[in-house]
Every structure is written in C-alpha cells, then in structure tokens.
Amino acid sequence: MATTAAAAAAADSTPLQVCGCKGIRTCLICERQRHGSPPWQRSPQKKHCFLYCPDTGWAMGPKDSDLEGWAFPFPGVTLIKDFVTPEEEAEMVRLMDSDPWKLSQSGRRKQDYGPKVNFRKQKLKMAGFQGLPSFSQKVVRRMGLYPGLEDFRPVEQCNLDYSPERGSAIDPHLDDAWLWGERLVSLSLLSATVVSMSREAPGSLLLSSAPALGPDALKGSIVAPSRSVPCQEVEVAISVPCRSLLVLTGAARHQWTHAIHRRHIQARRVCATFRELSSEFLPGGKQQELGQELLQAALSFQGRPV
C-alpha cells in the first residue's frame, strides 16, 4: 500500500499555471486566470439523482430522498472490483509516469496509444502508432477471463490523469461509434470516483418499485410503473472503486452520456480506457484490412504514447 500512496503523491511536473483548455472547457487554472465561474455553475443541475446498484443492475433512488423505493433497470454496466492488485496498480502508474503526459481539456492530462483520428472527416492514419504499452499486456489477457470480455481485443488505450488541484473533470459525452466498437472498458487507479450518466432524450422515464431480490426478482409478474420523471432531469451515479474495471455496453454505451464531475475527484486518479474496433474495421467490414493492421500493431504491446 505504501507504493500506491507514493504513486498517488507523486509530484505533478506540469506547472499549475498552464492548462490545455480550449473553447468552453475550463479548469481551476484558467478559471482563476479569467476570474470567471466554471460552466457547471451556470448550467442547470439534474433534479433526479439515482444510484447504480451493481447487485441488481438497477438505478435506485437514494435513501432519505423523495426517490427512495423507486428504481428503473439500467442495463449495459459491468463493474469488476479489485481487477488489479495494489502492487500492480503502483507499477502501472510508475510506468505511465515514466513517459510524458500531455495537457488536455478540463484540467486533465493524457497519454494516447492509438492511431491519429479525425472523427469529423472519418479518417485515420497510423502516424507512429506502434501498439499498446507493454505493461497492459497482462491486463488485456486478464480481461479475457471474464464473461462478456472473452473476445475483447483493444486497439486503442487512452490514459487520463485527474487532479483536484487542477479541477479535473470530463463533460458528458458519447464515445464515437464509427471507429470504436461495442464495449468501452476503463480501469480506475489510485482513487475512487463516480461516473455520472445522463440522457438528453425527450419524454419521461418510468419508475417501478425497487427490486429486493436481484435483476430476476420481477420476472413472471407485471409491475405497472407508478411514477415517471423527465428523462432530461435524471442522472445515474455509478460508484467506481479504486482498481476496478468498468465496462459500458448497449444503452449505457450508446444512449446515456458519461461524465466525471469535478467534485468527484478528491485525489489523484489515473484511468486507462481501452477501446475495440467497430464492425466496419473487422472481418467482413469495408475497412477490414486497415482494421487488421491496427490490431496487429496494437496487440504487439510495443507502443509508446503518440
């Protein structure tokens, strides 16, 4: 545990007065320089907050709130606790810190292992991409031991470094679906956080009585929803422990945006997100040859940040 604490307390080599924010994105550094309030203080907050329950797969109303006892199914989330050991965590962060971090938006720093991509024009090039880092080989192999990840072959890894001193956060967003495939897989290191899910869809979300016996408790019976809330006012909080693996698929991947609010970064957090190819780049797809080239490079595990 001492090694993990030492990694978490490692000095940030990036001067605090420098940030990588552009456009509407801000962090504590540029907010202080501009003497302005951050965008989230000017934006309306979600009125109906639910907590994701990994045991049931439902989004549950918090205790001691007007939503207590109400819930709705929230499919597409898998949370694997203690995916790596504290010793593996400390070694991974040590190796990440041995390479330079680049400034990114909203107080983050990043390291990219993947092709150079222009998502707007749907173009990509290898541009020096030589594969995922060597220290991820064991992690990727271990992923294949879990149900739903047996055939997961990542072609891109993005490391993000969050710091409370920089006011790090990431705005609600959906990951691209032209290049990246069905599963988004993220490994959280150094500290816990909360991933906040929201959906900017019209209409209402129907609520039922919270299940007591797991996701199959309501099978065989018809439960009429007895309450509804506007979908755009709902936020689902997924508690993500340190050293856990979070997998988003289906509706959680394609319909609900994911974000990390500034208030949920209480200590340094490093996240490694792994992405697979979409069907367009797999056998039978119109860009299968390029996809094969990307996979061969990625799974050589000889890469450095690009």
Which stretches of residues belong to each language-model region?
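Non-heme Fe(II) oxygenase metal-center motifs and adjacent flexible, charged/small-residue loops
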Residues: 1-306
